[in-house]
Amino acid sequence: MYKRQGLYNTGILGAISEFGSYCISITGVIGVLYRPLMLIAYSEGRHDDLVRTVVDGAYIVGLISSLLCGIVMGLSVPILKVWLNDEISHYWLWLVIKMFIIPITTFGSTYSIIYNLWNNVRSSALWSLAIAVIYVGTSVVLLELGVNMTAFLIIGAVAAIMQGAVLHIAIYSHIYPQSMPKVYVRLWRCCAYFALVFGLSFAIDYFINASNLFTLLVEGVLALLVALCVAPIFINAEDLDALDVILPIKTVMRWLNFNWTRQNA
C-alpha cells in the first residue's frame, strides 16, 4: 500500500488505526460479558431467554459503543491535534471512518454467538471468505487506479460492516426469524443514538475548539455528560435490566435511594 499511497499517508493511517484498536478492545470486552449467559440459556434449552439475552445484549453493547465512538468522532479534530499535531488533524475524516464501523460491527458481532452455539459456522466462513476476496480484489483495482486514501477507507468500512454486522445478523435471522423485527428496531435506535452523540459532540467542539489537553478533557467531559443525558430516550426498563447484568446500575440506585431515605427519616 505504501508504494501507492505514500509512506507518510500510510504512517498517519497506522496511527489512526491504533487509536481505533483501543476503542475496539474496550467494546469487545463489554460484548464478551453477555456470552456466558447465552451459553447457559442454550445449554438449558431456554431459547426464549437466549433470544432475549442476545437481542438486549447486542443493543446495550451497541449503545455503549455508540457513546464512546460518537464522542471520539465528534472530537476527532482536537483529538488528533492534541495527540499527534495540528497537521495530522486535517486527516480527521479518516478517524471518523474508522470509528464509524465499530458500533455497527459490535452490535452485529454479538449475534455471532448464536450460530456458533448451533454449530452452524460453515455459512459464516464461506461468506466471510467471499467478502474478503471481493474486498481485496476491489482494493487492488482501486490502488492501481490511484484513488485517494479516503475512498479506500470507505470501501474497507463497507466490507467490515458486511462481514461484521450484516453477515452475522443474516445468519441469525435463519435460526430465530421471529425476533428479527425487534432486532431491526434495536439496530435503528442504536444508529440514531450514535448519530445524535456524534452531532452533539461535534457541536461542542465547534463552540469550544480545543487546542490543548485541558480543553480537550473539558470537551470530552461535556460530551459525555450530554450523551448520558439523552441516553434515557433510548433506554427502557427492559434495557436497564440487561445493562444491570454487567453494570449494577439498579443496585447502586437502590443503595443511594436507601441511604437518602434513611438520612431523611
Outline where the language-model segments fall:
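Interfacial segments at transmembrane-helix termini and the short loops linking adjacent helices
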Residues: 7, 55, 72-103, 176
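Transmembrane helix-bundle signature of multi-pass secondary active exporters and lipid flippases
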Residues: 13-32, 64-68, 98-105, 160-163
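Interfacial transmembrane-helix starts/ends
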Residues: 14, 46-75, 92-95, 184, ...
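Membrane-proximal transmembrane or re-entrant/amphipathic helices at the cytosolic face
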Residues: 178, 201-265
